[in-house]
Structures are given as structure tokens and as C-alpha cells.
Design a protein with these regions (language model features):
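Thiamine diphosphate
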Residues: 1-108
Length: 108
């Protein structure tokens, strides 16, 4: 017979959940531009860093296009993540086909 263990229930916002999931993959670099509604993801990841739970390098960009470029460059040597919004994804779009052609991975 299979024994079911008690599960801990945690209530988080979508952004907090995304940051928590990102923490689990122990990524190396986050290129980001704070844009609503995804700003909280970078804030939560920075909080994890301040608590010593992550050693991620966070690189702020001057726009979504630049943030995607930071992730593209960093993906050649480590795990990267970028958090954005629908509008931010549109601004970053020019970078993505180039990166996909090189097969360097990025969590978006």
C-alpha cells in the first residue's frame, strides 16, 4: 500500500510562484528590466539572494531588448532567466530568433 505523506500548502501570487520555481533550478544570471506586472519576480529573486538562498548574478538592463541580449550572452556559459510581460516580450522579440538559432537555452 502506498503511504501518502502530508503536503504543505503554500499560497503565493503568480510572480512569487515563478520566482520560487526559478530558485529551484539554481540559475546563474538574470538579465531583467522591471516592467509591470513581472517586476515582483526580480524583487523576490533579489530577496532570495539577500537571504543567501541564491548566488545568482542579477544584471539590470535599460530595456527589454537589452535584457534579452544580456540573457543571450550569459547563456553561453550558464543558466539564465528573464522575467517579462506581454509588452516586454514584444520589445525583446528581435533577440529571440537569433538566440534560438544558436541553441543557447534561456528560461523566459
Amino acid at each position: 500500500m502506498v503511504k501518502v505523506t502530508d503536503q504543505k500548502r503554500v499560497f503565493k501570487s503568480g510572480n512569487e510562484g515563478a520566482a520560487w520555481a526559478a530558485k529551484q533550478i539554481d540559475f546563474d544570471v538574470m538579465g531583467y528590466y522591471p516592467i509591470t506586472p513581472s517586476t515582483q519576480i526580480a524583487e523576490e529573486i533579489d530577496l532570495y539572494r539577500s537571504e543567501g538562498l541564491l548566488t545568482t548574478k542579477m544584471i539590470p538592463a535599460e530595456g527589454e531588448h537589452s535584457a534579452a541580449g544580456i540573457c543571450y550572452g550569459a547563456s553561453t556559459g550558464g543558466r539564465v532567466i528573464n522575467a517579462t510581460s506581454a509588452n516586454g516580450l514584444l520589445y525583446a522579440l528581435e533577440q529571440l530568433p537569433v538566440q534560438s538559432g544558436t541553441r543557447y537555452p534561456m528560461v523566459l
